[in-house]
Amino acid sequence: KAKGERLQAKGRNTRLHLRNVFLMAVSWFFYYKTSGLFLLLLLFVTLSDWLIARRIYEAKSRESKLAKWWLALSVIIDLGLLCYFKYAYFFTNVVNDLLGTEFAVFDLFAYIGNGFSESGRFMVDSIILPVGISFYLFQVMSYTIDVYRGHVQPVKNILDFGFYVSFFPQLVAGPIVRANEFIPQLYRPFRLSRRLFGLAIFWVLNGLIKKIVLSDYLAVNLIDRVFENPLLFSGFENLFALFAYSLQVYADFSGYTDIAIGIAMLMGFY
């Protein structure tokens, strides 16, 4: 009987692992179709933070001060990548204006994609921002910080960690998922009751209403018209359009978040 229970548990764990690997492969393919070569950046971040988190845990278990240095390395790598892709133009322009230099941002990914040729050396205003970079970088940072604080143990299997980082419903537009909330669900059997199915459909429809009915309607029928020709409208109408723009941004992100929550629930994650 005990042997049968062990075999049953082993089979269940194998099915869970295969499910996670399949969803991770789908997520990577999804990101490749939206971002192309920037999939390499996602894979690099996944590998580096998985390795660093394990070093942090080992150092903490020995009460070594190296844990802080490993955490600092993780933060430097993640924030360095974020600053490079999001703020390289800004800082380069500031330096050029102050010092009269002619520095340009070197686009490594364009260089690789162009076959290691000089055509990959883009000017300052040519570098492309990877899709969802802010979300997955802050997510892996929250993971290493949680490991350092002892809120979660490091993931042993890199494929499971890769799934946590790249899960496609929240990869592009969030929400950012905390490791101590999501990772335990990787090893939980799939369960979707009638109530959870109905709740998931509600979240998806709620997000679609926010996005299509509210956000897109405001953008097309009010905000774009006023912003394109502000002098044709009164001061009150311009002010109203500014408030409507804030509502549009909220409805966009909130709608995407609701849709991501609903899709994740349909797959057994909530």
Positions of the model-derived regions?
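Membrane-embedded transmembrane alpha-helical bundles that form the catalytic cores
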Residues: 1, 9-270
